Amino acid sequence: MSESSIRVVCFDLGGVVVRICRSWEEACARAGVPIREPSKFALQQFAQQRHSLVDLYQTGRLECDAYWRAIAQATGGLYSPDEVERVHSAWTMEDYPGVADLIADLNRREGVLTACLSNTNPRHWAILRGDRSPREPGSPAIAGLRRTLVSHELGLAKPDAAIYAAAERALDARPPEILFFDDLEENTRAAAQRGWRTVTIDHQRDTAAQMRSHLRTHGVLD
């Protein structure tokens, strides 16, 4: 392996490892739930409520059933809790092509630890891990990661500086030893402020190819 100071390659999940819906409307279409009154749904009072609920949910402070009910209320009654659950469960999709192979290649590199640091929640995490049903095997790429750090278990979320500090402790790595891929600039910027090596990924392009290129630049891959 080429000389590199990188000891940990850390991935965000949605938009980097796994395709996800990028809007409520897209998830509704996947779930077979009608889109109702977009102008009412988008009202600021409801949008702010939903944002606060997502923060509680993804940091482990709100159970799934309570989240469905609360989000349904924060749509102004446009959607039922059952419909919210269906839309939410449709949000995650398949791995980006080539990412599982990339992680497998990294796992063969001596001295390199693969990990994720993701804002997620119990339902999405169960789907991604294949814990819900034998018919839903989960993400092969995520199954290949040596360490998984997720917001609802940590009680913290990106871009809070505290989650990056918690990751450093969990991974037993200094900031410059971590190379972090995320599709949101606010998250890579916060990690960079702690001294992490960071790359913002374009989720609309080949994510595996982007990451391979940067891993070669950093001397992690030949």
Q: Could you say what each language-model-derived stretch is?
A:
Residues G98-E110:
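Catalytic-core regions built around general acid/base machinery
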Residues E3-D101, N121-W125:
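N-terminal helical cap/lid subdomain that shapes the substrate entry/recognition surface
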Residues S2-V9, A104, N121-D222:
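Asp-based, Mg2+/Mn2+-dependent phosphohydrolase catalytic module
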Residues A29, Q58, Q73, R108, ...:
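Short polybasic/polar patches that bind polyanions
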Residues D12-G15, G60, L106, C116, ...:
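Generic structural signal for small/hydrophobic residues in well-ordered secondary structure
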Residues G111-L117, N121-P122:
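Structured, non-catalytic alpha/beta "coupling" segments that mediate domain-domain communication
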Residues V33, G77, V112, A173, ...:
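Short glycine/serine/threonine/alanine-rich loop segments
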Residues R36, S80, T114-A115, P176, ...:
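A local structural micro-motif
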